[in-house]
Amino acid sequence: MSQSNNATTSQHRTAIPAGAGTLFFVQTFATLGFAVLYSTLVLYATKKLGFSEDNANAIMGVFGAFNYGLHMFGGYLGGRYLSNRNLFVLGMVLQVFGCALIAMEGVTGLYWGLAMFLTGSGLNVTCLNMMLTQRFAPDDDRRESAFLWNYAGMNLGFFIGFAVAGYFQLSENYRALFLFATLGNLAAIVVTLSRWSILADISTPLKEVSRSQWLRRLAVGIAILIVLVPVIRMLLTHAEFSSYFVVALGIVIFALMTVVTFRHRNAGERRRMKAYLLLALGSLVFWMLYQLAPMGLMLFSENNINLNVYGIRVAPQWIQNINTVVIVIGGPLMALWFNRLRQRGWNIDIPAQFSASLFCMGLGMLVLPLGIHLAGGDGLVAFKWIAISYVLQSIGELLISPIGYAMIGKLAPPRYQGVMMGCWMMVTGVASVLASYISGLMPQNAGSTPLLTNPGYSQVFNALGWGSVATGVVLLILIPLLRRMIHREPSVA
């Protein structure tokens, strides 16, 4: 009897739950289309459709903000109306049609295609993460490793998507590129449908309703999807208003979550929800700096970094692949490393990782003023400094992002898991808008030189770096408190 129990416990600790491996491949394929659009939208709009750079960048900003902002609603819609797996497949179908419309190479097709794509991608990311977190019990430590693997799969999708986008960009064959994006989306649908039964929802409000109620909710959910497309189409044409709207919505959602938390009756769950709110505030600082990559950091790389490396001209967009490589390689390695440290008695937990991530981000910013100080006579900064910065930022991302997703299952009561997962992802949407405001504080490069703009960049990077380090110190001080808030009392037999 004892041997049987030990075997069962050992299997529980080592075996991968059914569906977790499938979701790795689903994540990879689902990311392809987003990677293509994310990396090509501005170039496509300016080179093929004749948009001004300001117009194209404004659309890209709204694209990023609403992609993340819709994550919160995706958790609610999936958990209460459509089910996570149904909403995921419907979202991928919208992405297929969206990419096909964009491939028509017209302005009308672009706006409607983006609206359909955003509706799908914004809603289904939360569903994918919820399908994964529901494979594990709240106290199952394997959840963190599974999310690290899943996060590596997502970045593998980004790597492939960026590589293919660059290949077609050389010939500006955008039609073929966006049609390729539809193939990735279709592959994600096929894999999901092939493993449909093992990806069923667990412990969501929708599981508790009758068949007739489920059908009514399904109809309402589909109607919401249909209405969202023209609404997002309209908001894409009003980028400034949309940015303010995302920030205001984020503030309202955080305020509502605070009220819900303090009114929650279960003392243990209320304590863990408070820890969630504190960690969310800390993560906002990290993601605000992280989202500078396609904005202020991209312009700094293009204008102030020496991009001739060993005689090879490096495109600014390729620098993003430093992040992708670190995540793909580092994700599984960090999972193995953390498992070994825990076996040796190290307390590697959520508060410690969050604090460490902010230190990494701060150092990633602070190496740039050092590189600027050591710049050549022409003001160009050596490529190694931006590379080091991205490596440090990527390590910070590994510490906070997949662990942030995994912590929802640990801290959120079952009835709030979908909404809290969406709120967590909406933090990134708000951070994206705030990053655009910070980018506006950086020097303007038009008609200037690196020698003139370097002091301004150095000042901003110093402020951002020390701000991130200071936030990391605050979380470091709060680690004992956060650990007490997160701790679960042992159940009484």
Mark where each language-model region is.
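Short amphipathic helix-loop junctions that connect adjacent transmembrane helices
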Residues: L37-N55, A293-I319
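Glycine-rich segments within core transmembrane alpha-helices of 12-TM secondary carriers
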Residues: R142-A163, Q169, T182-A188, T192, ...
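C-terminal ends and interior cores of transmembrane alpha-helices
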Residues: V93-Y111, A356-D378
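Intracellular loop-helix junctions on the cytosolic face of multi-pass helical membrane proteins
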Residues: M1-A18, P138, Q169-P294, M298, ...
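Intracellular juxtamembrane helix-capping segments at the cytosolic ends
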Residues: L123-A137, L398-A412
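Conserved MFS/SLC helix-loop-helix module at the cytosolic interface between two early adjacent transmembrane helices
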Residues: H71-G106
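Central cavity-lining transmembrane alpha-helices of secondary-active solute carriers
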Residues: G61-G78, V125, N321-M334
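Cytoplasmic membrane-interface "Motif A"-like loop-to-helix N-cap segments
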Residues: R80-M92, R340-F359
